[in-house]
Amino acid sequence: MCIRDRFYDIANQVKPKADQHIDWNRSHLHIASAYTPEAVQYAKDYFKNGIDFLLDDGPHTLDSMIDCVKLYAPLMNQGGVLMIEDVQSKDWFQQLSAVAPSGVLFEAIDLTASGRYDDLIAVYQF
């Protein structure tokens, strides 16, 4: 097997399948490193009325997850939800809970009964 066979061609394989399920009149896809000041400023400028839902599927490191909460919590709308998937250890929930802004409900979701180690999700309800 050639190494290139292990990579997806986003434009020709993934996007056409996504197009079948996504209403692009109501959805926007932005691909970038979310953990830079430029990305946060872009999000702030683009989502002038705030963010209702944010899903972090980043590098899967504890530091990046904490950064996500610290960087994007100020942009979240009241009633909004910020989810971080693929939390790598149940032990991380304590630190992820500790960075929840005041008044924000934190929920640790453990779906590891499915047999997959990475089915841990941190949810912040604003």
Which residue stretches match the model-derived regions?
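Conserved SAM/SAH-binding beta-strand->alpha-helix loop
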Residues: A11
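Alpha-helix C-terminal capping segments
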Residues: Q20-D23, F47, L96-A100
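C-terminal substrate-binding/active-site "lid" region of AdoMet-derived donor-dependent transferases
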Residues: L62-F126
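Short, conserved SAM-binding/catalytic segment
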Residues: V14-S27
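The conserved SAM/SAH-binding core of class I Rossmann-like methyltransferase domains
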Residues: Y8
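Short, small-residue-biased leader/transition segments that mark boundaries at the very start
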Residues: M1-I3
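Active-site segment flanking the S-adenosylmethionine/decSAM binding pocket
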Residues: S27-D91
